[in-house]
């Protein structure tokens, strides 16, 4: 009996609860009048076969082609909305995966800032719809407080889980939606008119996938000619247009992110303390080139570019393994799931950072750290060739070991040259005011659709 139950649970994991129940019902209905003992003898079930064979024969396992196609990428399943008459004030809904701790950095924080500023400027209500977990309002409160944003109306939160969990959320006829990924855009497009959607795109998301179904679905959304696009940085905007997305040029605009001095700034340092080298370490985000970064750091240590008598290495990110450098003689410090305040404090105490990103977007850590007074070494990619227009404390190298080692050597030299490093910091061209960053975006929301 226990083996039968285990097989049932395995079938459920593979095909889902709905398909399991449907399979049982269909087989039972067809065979309910069969005489006892008429089921054919069958050999012992192979491990990969479903337990349903035991009860209903060997022709089990057929699934709906439509359901299989829909289940392949469940995150793009349509939002389950019901329409209600438009109310006052009007509402703007931000659709994202999560706003909880561990998700607030970079792109998610930017989406909340943008949505809040648009709601503030248009006197609209803000609603945040999350898909992977219920929202913790504290996440939004931290962002709004950090950047001094005040909303007139109470923020609403709704949970629209991916999968079979039943839910329905209301939707105004004139509601505007800000989506934050190709999958949240696909889910929203399936439920509302395309003219009500603005897609905040902060990376070439096609690069998340090998060529296949997911890549193709993503490319379909990025090529949509009926929705508006807001692109994070001109670099990414130019790349997307040049890569065959003229609709982004026609229906899109770009903004440059901001790094207010109240948050990102150099901190006071203890005299005589070793300098700090930060490595942005995310082994499960493959575009951050975690393993190449380890190789690069080990080579820099072996060649004397990074002297561990003078430098401490700090690994910051997520799911970081326990690592020792220099043939096991040096144990690096690991920091994970930092709060926004802790992250800003860390950035302000960093001298040199290695931040790799195998995509056209510069990513946030190089900007966060340069805005906090650090020197940053990062890589070139496509049209991302030179980031000195943001800060001369950002050094780019080609993704070859020798080129990146040369960039590391330049980074160490600059980080230890207090005068030049300070001059570069004082002449940073990074934005410092989110309202200025999103001024044109807000104007677009204030205008007619």
What is each model feature region?
Residues 71-74, 78-81, 206-213, 253-274:
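Acidic anion/phosphate-binding donor-loop and adjacent secondary structure
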Residues 107-110, 127, 237-340:
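Conserved catalytic-core segment of nucleotide-activated headgroup transferases in glycan assembly
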Residues 166-172, 212-230:
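Membrane-proximal helix-turn-helix segments that form the acceptor-binding/catalytic region
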Residues 187-188, 208-209, 225-250:
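A short, active-site helix/loop in glycosyltransferases that binds the activated sugar's phosphate group
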Residues 357-358:
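Aromatic "clamp/platform" in nucleotide-sugar-dependent glycosyltransferases that forms part
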Residues 375-379:
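Short hydrophobic beta-strand element within catalytic cores of glycosyltransferases
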Residues 399, 413-449:
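A charged, aromatic-enriched C-terminal amphipathic alpha-helix characteristic of glycosyltransferases
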